[in-house]
Amino acid sequence: MLTHYQLCFQKRSSQNYTVPDPTSCFDVPPWTILCQRATMIMHNNSSALPLFSNVSSFWKRDSHGPGLLDEGASLIGSYDSPETTESFPFSTVETTNSSLNATIKDPLGGHAVWQVVLIAFLTGIIALVTIIGNILVIVSFKVNKQLKTVNNYFLLSLACADLIIGVISMNLFTTYIIMGHWALGNLACDLWLSIDYVASNASVMNLLVISFDRYFSITRPLTYRAKRTTKRAGVMIGLAWIISFVLWAPAILFWQYFVGKRTVPLDECFIQFLSEPIITFGTAIAAFYLPVTIMSILYWRIYKETEKRTKELAGLQASGSEAETARFVHQTGSSRSLSSYELQRQSTKRSSRRKYRRCHFWLTMKSWEPNTDQGDQEHSSSDSWNNNDAAASLENSASSDEEDITAETRAIYSIVLKLPGHSAILNSTKLPSSEDLNESADELQKSDTDSQEKKPKKLQPPKSIQDGGSFQKSFSKLPIQPGSAETATASDGISSVTKTSAALPLSFKEATLAKKFALKTRSQITKRKRMSLIKEKKAAQTLSAILFAFIITWTPYNIMVLVNTFCDCVPKTVWNLGYWLCYINSTVNPVCYALCNKMFRNTFKMLLLCQCDKRKRRKQQYQQRQSVIFHKRIPREAS
């Protein structure tokens, strides 16, 4: 049997020989083409050798010339002898060649070595950072009890989805890019695509849940946070994963059975139904465009609400040097000024307020009017003292840095004023005005005069007070009623004046007490609001960073998906980059936590520096010392 080398030798010895065609005078192709074809078939595949077992018929088949030439001519489809008794099996050779091409693909996918090294290095670094970052989030949630909040449960679910992407999706897609073809079969392809799309969409759904949680926590802090439990958070997380699974997994795994055939080639891996425009648009809208629209709207509302809270807090923390008015707020929320407590502060320095103290308030009372009539001086002095004492009582019960009483403290007034046993206060819709106080004082003086009690005495000679002008006013002492008395000391040389608590209406005392409690708790309320606002700002910053990263990384791919539905005009390199950008979002999320959340940042640092064991040891040592101290104290106490 002649080998293929012998055939090529005989071919080269007769290179100039041509076979005349008795019917069409067709020139046979050069010997070079025929030799290359025969050599490839017989050298690369032993299964093709039986085709040439009858070498004599293959080499010299008829009288027109060497049979090899005849067979070579028929092999390229250009010569067919009518006297041929055997035909060369052309279809078998072509099938063999196609199988050879499938099994001898370039393992580097046509890439140069340096390109493969660069791709593997970059994608490997990104995958490693993704895995480490999301593992840090999960471990931080485990070791730090302060991170076990409802909001962080959503971040934990997001980290799990991103970890799946880093471990499975990134590495398989990198292998697919480098090799240039899919080498793991159809089943592995469908499973990879299912895990990839479900985890990616779960990441999106978790971001959507976090956005809703932040929005309701800020806009409905009382009603929503009472219902915001760990169990409800688990239900919402479960729904996010279930929706993602239902949206992608069945369609990816069973679409070939729905349509009755699989159109994805064996050496490629992509979603089969992406060629259907309606389904592609539907999944793109449900998986990306609708969630990103909702998240953008929610974030805008969160931003506006946070800005509004910031302005309110700035109003609560307004400087005492600014002109402000102490206001009581009606329970319906409408602001209503009360003249007896309307302490119209002038824009003066604190030193001026300390200098004049009560006199400053006495001079700025609206109800006080200078009276030069000597006959009415005592009565006017009594009225003026009434008003001035009201202001002085308020000044004694609060610091000089009082702030406006806004809606946050109206509940305190309601509680204090609605004490049992005071029907007059319960039935009143507003606190007594200065006119009411004046009338009460007038009636009290009149009743005292009728009962022939002692008349009010002059306390001191008139004293001049300088505050933008000269005022001269004398003070009178109100009649003393039976009961406990208080002593109010006037500053700047004004002598002590003794008055009774019964001289003022009971409602005024309760109003003063209400203001005292309100101002005392005001700093605590402001502090709590400030801390709450800081937390809301941090949460909004974290959400904004995550949302921004999500939009940047996911938009290119989802645009290419829609474009690819109508035309196959997206370059393969651009498609791979867009696909990888979606993966990078899973890398960015843990970085957003670390940059925007101090608690996560400190826990990351503790874990990376291996300080967790040291912290536990210090805690154990502290507990042991405390135990020793406790046991030492017991015998002493027993003795």
UniProtKB/Swiss-Prot annotation:
Keywords: Cell membrane, Disulfide bond, G-protein coupled receptor, Glycoprotein, Membrane, Phosphoprotein, Postsynaptic cell membrane, Receptor, Synapse, Transducer, Transmembrane, Transmembrane helix. Residues 382-393 have a biased composition (Low complexity). The keyword Secreted does not apply. Residues 370-404, 431-471 are annotated as: Disordered. Residues 1-115, 174-190, 256-277, 564-576 are extracellular. Its main location: membrane. SMART domains: 7TM_GPCR_Srsx. This is Muscarinic acetylcholine receptor M3. It comes from Gallus gallus (Chicken).
